[in-house]
């Protein structure tokens, strides 16, 4: 079954995440483990490893690292992605999330809904960028890309 069965966030930031960021992380992990699609493509003519997979996400030397292991914890792959293509969309996502969290405290539902729609649009853009960057490295569906994008945001800013 080609899916992620365990995910770990290798977060080395000395600054603890805010309550909102921690909540986003926990929800994304829960949702990701409940339902996801993650497969490794054929490479160099060799059959790809079959899931389920254990995934560790980390940022090392300014690059996003996907460390992929079998359920038995044998390494089956690792790849690194440049953070450059994610920087602006992550920044935009965090700015709109801050606006959303503030709006929930003081604005009427109609204005909160408008901000939430903008937040979802930016989140979808981040998922699209991630799917593009994963091309040839891993195959994911859009919902999996959305949840992984949330975790990348937590890593990037947490």
Curated annotation (Swiss-Prot):
Alphabetical list of Pfam families matching this protein: UPF0262 (PF06793)
InterPro entries: UCP032146 (IPR008321)
Top-rank lineage group of the source organism: Bacteria
Family assignment from sequence similarity: Belongs to the UPF0262 family.
Name of the molecule in the record: UPF0262 protein Rsph17029_2283
Organism expressing this protein natively: Cereibacter sphaeroides (strain ATCC 17029 / ATH 2.4.9)
């Amino acid at each position: 079954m080609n899916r992620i069965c365990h995910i770990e966030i290798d977060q080395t930031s000395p600054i603890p995440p805010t309550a909102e960021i921690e909540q986003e992380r926990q929800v994304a992990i829960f949702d990701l483990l409940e339902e996801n699609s993650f497969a490794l493509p054929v490479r160099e003519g060799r059959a790809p490893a079959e899931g389920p997979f254990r995934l560790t996400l980390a940022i090392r030397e300014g690059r996003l690292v996907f460390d992929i292991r079998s359920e038995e914890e044998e390494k089956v792959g690792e790849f690194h992605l440049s953070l450059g293509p994610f920087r602006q969309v992550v920044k935009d996502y965090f700015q709109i999330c801050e606006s959303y969290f503030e709006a929930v405290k003081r604005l009427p539902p109609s204005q909160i809904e408008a901000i939430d729609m903008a937040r979802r649009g930016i989140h979808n853009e981040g998922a699209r960028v991630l799917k593009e960057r994963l091309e040839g490295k891993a195959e994911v569906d859009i919902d999996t890309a959305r949840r992984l994008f949330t975790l990348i945001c937590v890593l990037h800013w947490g």
